[in-house]
Amino acid sequence: MGRLFVIDLEGLVYSCKYCQTHFAVTNDIISKSFHCKHGRAYLFDNVVNVTVGEKEHRVMITGWHTVADIFCVSCGSLVGWKYEIAYDKSQKYKEGKFILERFKVLGPYGGGYDMNQNEPMTGSDDEE
């Protein structure tokens, strides 16, 4: 097995809740209005320190997408998915972007998943 290179991000970061490996900075959040099986999920423009799994077609609330699960490069935990292809024109903005499930990551202040019932969950995209 090769040497593992992990990128340490500066500033306010989201990290793995199991091993604290950095994934993304708050400035790369596109939307906090998504949700998944475990609750809230955030859409990010850039994510680091993940491996990308096999591409697969999934029917989600917003239609058909080709996605690939993403895993923490350090501990192997499933932490979200990457949008490869969005088949609906209105969903094309998601292509090449990443979902991090809040249940599986620590927030920028070390906090875990928090369920705020007052925030609307529009534009969500879990499987139907």
Curated annotation (Swiss-Prot):
Q: Which PROSITE patterns match?
A: YIPPEE (PS51792)
Binding-site residues, Zn(2+): 16, 19, 72, 75
Q: Name one GO molecular function term.
A: metal ion binding
List the disulfide bonds in this chain.
Answer: none
| Ranges where the Yippee domain occurs | 12-109
> What InterPro entries is this protein classified in?
Yippee (IPR034751), Yippee/Mis18/Cereblon (IPR004910), Yippee_fam (IPR039058)
Which UniProt keyword terms apply here?
A: Metal-binding, Zinc
Q: One Pfam family name from the record? A: Yippee-Mis18
- State the family named in the UniProt similarity comment for this chain: Belongs to the yippee family.
What protein am I looking at? Protein yippee-like At3g08990
Native species: Arabidopsis thaliana
Traced from the root, the source organism's taxonomic lineage reads: Eukaryota, Viridiplantae, Streptophyta, Embryophyta, Tracheophyta
